[in-house]
Design a protein with these regions (language model features):
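Short, small-residue-biased leader/transition segments that mark boundaries at the very start
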Residues: 1-3
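Active-site region of the double-stranded beta-helix
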Residues: 8-108, 123-129, 137, 141-176
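Conserved SET/PR-domain catalytic core that frames the SAM/AdoMet-binding pocket
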Residues: 108-122
Length: 176
């Protein structure tokens, strides 16, 4: 038995000093590049100074899923510990994607998932442990203005094949 098998969600939150987050369960920013890109050095919509990249831990629980949102930046999800995470992506062309981020490579899960910038996405746990610990790396570095919460009704209408999943995940979000 691995020592991580004995961890609870509360242990992970405490040990990694994770704080509640409006979009991604519980979060702690772990890196923002000390090097930056000057204003005007990136394509639209990035019009201000940006770190080259950023990274954060995030933990998802049944009542703190990844809310329906998008960020301007490309991002890469990484699996670390706990349950797999079922991620729903809503692509600009009207198609959808469903990918499970987790440890079961033989079962088709991935330990990394690329999410293109401006892709609405949401996620929920699948599994028995009731928590997921992962990370997200982004480039350029994310600023609060880069994050947009999705309009559930509008996106459910545009993506009817996953509307039930979107509503189910949204219903589990803890009150702020």
């Amino acid at each position: 038995m691995c020592s991580s098998d004995l961890l609870t969600a509360e242990d992970v939150r405490r040990l990694l000093e994770l704080e509640p987050n409006a979009t991604c369960g519980f979060v702690r920013i772990t890196y923002a590049s000390g090097q930056s890109i000057a204003a005007g050095g990136l394509p639209v919509p990035f019009d201000d100074v940006r770190p080259l990249g950023s990274a954060l831990y995030f933990m998802v629980t049944p009542t703190a899923p990844v809310r329906l949102h998008r960020i301007r930046n490309d991002q890469l999800y990484h699996y670390y510990l706990g349950d797999p995470l079922e991620v729903f992506m809503l692509h600009k062309d009207g198609s959808t994607g469903r990918v499970v981020v987790g440890p079961d490579l033989r079962g088709g899960e991935r330990v990394q998932l690329f999410i293109p910038g401006n892709t609405f996405h949401t996620a929920r746990l699948i599994g028995r442990r009731r928590w997921f610990l992962g990370a997200s790396t982004e480039w350029p570095g994310v600023e609060p203005a880069d994050v947009e919460i999705g309009n559930l009704d509008a996106l459910a209408a545009k993506y009817p094949l996953v509307a039930g999943d979107l509503r189910s995940i949204a219903a589990s979000v803890r009150p702020n």
